[in-house]
Structures are given as structure tokens and as C-alpha cells.
Amino acid sequence: MWQYSSSGKVDGISGNVDLDWCYVDYPSIIKGKTTTEEEKTPPQNPTAPAPKATYRVYTGKWLGEISGYNNINSNGYAGIEQKPIYGVTAKSSIGKLRYRVHTRNGRWLPWVSGYSTSDWNKGIAGSLGKIIDGVQFDLLNANGYTVKYRASINGTKNYLPWVTGTKDFAGIINGRNFIDKIQIEIVKK
């Protein structure tokens, strides 16, 4: 709506007259057609949200959830620098994410694919009191996508290289080190 002042005169009103202009397509409204056909047609290629991993770690307590690799409070990682991780839980917005961990001076624990902060058998990879020194993630049934992940170990502020799939793992299995931070990302193949 646009308002302006006219210098013209209107009978019965002294001085300038304020007029309101409203840009409405009244002929279309009168004919019953209020929008164009283009406006009624949905977009041909709506943008789908990018797939994301959601994950948490247990360091004596469950830390906050990281989702989509962009939690501003954690710079996109789960963990606390120089504090060991004992458990990991993770899920993906597409496909099925399975994962497992290696415990220091121990072995690879079984694969899990649930997402839980209470089920240490099906929804958490890890074991209470057992420090994690290696992790593996695998994304199943997600055509065109895979999981990429990396870890940081105690004694360094840097991350180890990114790992894709299960041909390798993130961490260092040597009996001395432990993982203190992880990052997980769902990416196109």
C-alpha cells in the first residue's frame, strides 16, 4: 500500500487530501483466478536437506549431541581434549550407520547400529571403564553416500587423517594412546 498527498481539491474537504493506493489485481479476483498457473506449480527440483550423522560420546558422562558436523559449542566434534572416551553412539539421517570401537589393550568390540545412551549392547559401542583407542564407522543402504570420520588422540591437538569406510580405522592402537575427540560426516561417494 502506498500513501501520498494530493494537491488537488475534493468537494467538501479543505486543503490537501491523503490518498491510499493499493496494488491489487481486482480483475483476477473478480474472475475467481487469484494466482497464476506458474504460482500454483510446485518447484521441479526442491532441495533436499543434506544427509547428516548425529553422534555422542561417553567420557564418564554423556556429552552433548553433535548433529550435522556443525555444533557451534563443540566445533563439530564430540569429546573433550585429553579426556578418554569410553562409549560412542551414532546414527545417520540416511541408510543405516553401524560402528564399533577398539579398547586399549583389548580388542575390537562387536558392531552396533542402534542409537542410545543406555543400551551398552545394541546402541553404544564401548564398555564402561574401557578406554577407546580405535573407531570404525560403516554406512549401509545409502546409495551415493558414505561415511567419513576421524579422531584426535591424547598428547596432540591435531586430528589423524580422515578415514572412509572400514578398510582402515581412526585411532592408534598401541597400548598407550586413547581417542579424545571424534568427527563424523556423511558425504557423497
Explain the meaning of each model-derived region:
Residues 1-43:
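Functionally critical loop-and-helix segments that line ligand-binding/catalytic clefts
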Residues 40-189:
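Lectin-type carbohydrate-recognition ectodomains
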